[in-house]
Amino acid sequence: MFHLVDFQVTIAEILLIIMRTFKVSIWNLDYIINLIIKNLSKSLTENKYSQLDEEQPMEID
């Protein structure tokens, strides 16, 4: 019979083997993910357009 716990353990073992072969630790992975998120958030929050406050409102006749 198929057991979910056995499946989860085998997935975890496979991930550990992959991480050992590529010499990636959980701490390094966390650091890399944080760097990616920080760079993405910086690029998204950069203001490339003029502020609405600086623009002149249109006059309606």
From Swiss-Prot:
**InterPro entries given in the database record:** NS6_bCoV (IPR022736)
Q: Does the keyword Membrane apply?
A: yes
Q: Which UniProt keywords apply?
A: Host endoplasmic reticulum, Host Golgi apparatus, Host membrane, Host-virus interaction, Inhibition of host innate immune response by virus, Inhibition of host interferon signaling pathway by virus, Inhibition of host STAT1 by virus, Inhibition of host STAT2 by virus, Interferon antiviral system evasion, Membrane, Viral immunoevasion, Virulence
Recorded GO cellular component terms are: host cell endoplasmic reticulum membrane; host cell Golgi membrane; membrane; nuclear pore
| Residue ranges, annotated region (Important for host Golgi localization) | 18-24
Identify the domain of life.
Viruses
Q: How does it sit in the membrane?
A: Peripheral membrane protein
**A molecular function GO annotation:** protein sequestering activity
Q: Report the principal subcellular site.
A: host cell
A GO BP annotation: symbiont-mediated suppression of host cytoplasmic pattern recognition receptor signaling pathway via inhibition of IRF3 activity
Q: Where in the cell is it found?
A: Host endoplasmic reticulum membrane; Host Golgi apparatus membrane
The impact of changing residue 61 to L is: In strain: Omicron/BA.2, Omicron/BA.2.12.1, Omicron/BA.2.75, Omicron/BA.4, Omicron/BQ.1.1, Omicron/XBB.1.5, Omicron/EG.5.1
Its job: Disrupts bidirectional nucleocytoplasmic transport by interacting with the host RAE1-NUP98 complex. Disrupts cell nuclear import complex formation by tethering karyopherin alpha 2 and karyopherin beta 1 to the membrane. Retention of import factors at the ER/Golgi membrane leads to a loss of transport into the nucleus. Prevents STAT1 nuclear translocation in response to interferon signaling, thus blocking the expression of interferon stimulated genes (ISGs) that display multiple antiviral activities. Suppresses IFN-beta production possibly by blocking IRF3 nuclear translocation.
The family assignment reads: Belongs to the coronaviruses accessory protein 6 family.
Quaternary state and partners of this protein? Interacts (via C-terminus) with host RAE1 in the NUP98-RAE1 complex; this interaction disrupts the host nuclear import. Interacts with host KPNA2; this interaction may inhibit IFN-beta production by blocking IRF3 nuclear translocation.
> This protein is called what?
ORF6 protein
Identify the species of origin: Severe acute respiratory syndrome coronavirus 2 (2019-nCoV)
